[in-house]
From Swiss-Prot:
Membrane-spanning parts: none
Catalytic residues as annotated in Swiss-Prot or TrEMBL: H172, C220
CDD domains attached to this UniProt entry: CARD_CASP1-like, CASc
GO molecular function term, any single one: cysteine-type peptidase activity
Family according to the record: Belongs to the peptidase C14A family.
CARD domain location: 1-92
Function noted in UniProt: May function as a negative regulator of inflammatory responses and innate immunity. May reduce cytokine release in response to bacterial lipopolysaccharide during infection. Reduces activation of NF-kappa-B in response to TNF. May lack protease activity.
Protein name: Inactive caspase-12
Amino acid sequence: MADEKPSNGVLVHMVKLLIKTFLDGIFDDLMENNVLNTDEIHLIGKCLKFVVSNAENLVDDITETAQIAGKIFREHLWNSKKQLSSDISSDGEREANMPGLNIRNKEFNYLHNRNGSELDLLGMRDLLENLGYSVVIKENLTAQEMETALRQFAAHPEHQSSDSTFLVFMSHSILNGICGTKHWDQEPDVLHDDTIFEIFNNRNCQSLKDKPKVIIMQACRGNGAGIVWFTTDSGKASADTHGRLLQGNICNDAVTKAHVEKDFIAFKSSTPHNVSWRHETNGSVFISQIIYYFREYSWSHHLEEIFQKVQHSFETPNILTQLPTIERLSMTRYFYLFPGN
């Protein structure tokens, strides 16, 4: 005979008991370690009482209610941490922020200036600072100056105590590199992608070994529109004139390089050979979508999921067509940002 299914009343009682037991343990630890005082525990408890008293909703729709409860709990712990962060450190000083780097090239000698990119710079700086990163900003650099800035940043002693870093690039670019301020067709001024990865790999930047290294690039990668037109009768597709496929570029040395280049993820604003759009007043579409989805989901989703949500927002082509791509992914674990923790 099959086991009898518990009634809703029994399930509700079980949920309430589990919540109470779980939270009692958390609050005891917070009090014993002087992280939260009695008033702060009481304040959090008032909000969590709502969750316990509505355990029926947990049974009926556990996913939705768990998200609400998690958001309430996270916000209170985040506010408490900001208020008490100076007391948690043993020497009375605030915790050191994790270093992040943002390189923006707006003004060029031969290429057109990237008007509107200041909004991208301010938006990303605000986002990363809210995620706990101390952002170093460098502007209007040649390729050699960008490489020097990267090597100096890789040598920061703060990386020893950090758990990750962000590298954000905003510039013109070619297929596999970021353009410096002196770039033109007759005399390229390019910081190649391989150079960036080489500077921060485990051989040359051991303080970031086994730590996520997130690279975000807002830049065109060619002149193509990145679309094909399909006819409804024959189903044949015709590509734009710049849409030539890249062939023969698959390497077979991944096993050899796996322990050298590890824990990277690069998120680029468009597919190879194609453009990336930027509004002179509102900034780039790619950066604005990153900021939106990070703010919405970084507390609950891992980094790849957030990047995929950004990609999904570009899935249907419209007037301004581009598709961000995740590249050179070598992280072996999911990376959760958990702002406030």
